[in-house]
C-alpha cells in the first residue's frame, strides 16, 4: 500500500506573514480582598446570590476569581443561608 501525504496550507501568520500578538488574559482579582471589599455574611442574600448559578449551584472560583480561602468562607455562608431558608437549595 502506498501512503499519500497531503499538505494543508498554513495560516498567514505561520507562513511568515504578519505575526499575531498573543492574547493577553487579564488576571482576575478576588472581589473579597483589598480595601472596601464586602464581608462574607450568610445574611447578605444579595451578595451571596451573585455567586450562585441560575440552577442554585455554587459557582466555582475559577469563574468568579475568588481566592481559595474566601471561596471556602463563601460556600459555608451559602450553606448556612440555605439551611436557614434564606436561599433555595435548587431552582426549578
From Swiss-Prot:
Part of the 30S ribosomal subunit. Forms a tight heterodimer with protein bS6. It comes from the Bacteria. GO terms for biological process: translation. Residues 11-21 have a biased composition (Low complexity). This is Small ribosomal subunit protein bS18. Binds as a heterodimer with protein bS6 to the central domain of the 16S rRNA, where it helps stabilize the platform of the 30S subunit. Keywords: Ribonucleoprotein, Ribosomal protein, RNA-binding, rRNA-binding. Belongs to the bacterial ribosomal protein bS18 family.
Amino acid at each position: 500500500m502506498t501512503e499519500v501525504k497531503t499538505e494543508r496550507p498554513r495560516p498567514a501568520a505561520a507562513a511568515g506573514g504578519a505575526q499575531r500578538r498573543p492574547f493577553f488574559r487579564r488576571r482576575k482579582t478576588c472581589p473579597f480582598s483589598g480595601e472596601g471589599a464586602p464581608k462574607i455574611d450568610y445574611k447578605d442574600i444579595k451578595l451571596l446570590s451573585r455567586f450562585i448559578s441560575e440552577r442554585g449551584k455554587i459557582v466555582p472560583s475559577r469563574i468568579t476569581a475568588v481566592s481559595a480561602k474566601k471561596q471556602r468562607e463563601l460556600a459555608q455562608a451559602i450553606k448556612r443561608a440555605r439551611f436557614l431558608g434564606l436561599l433555595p437549595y435548587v431552582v426549578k
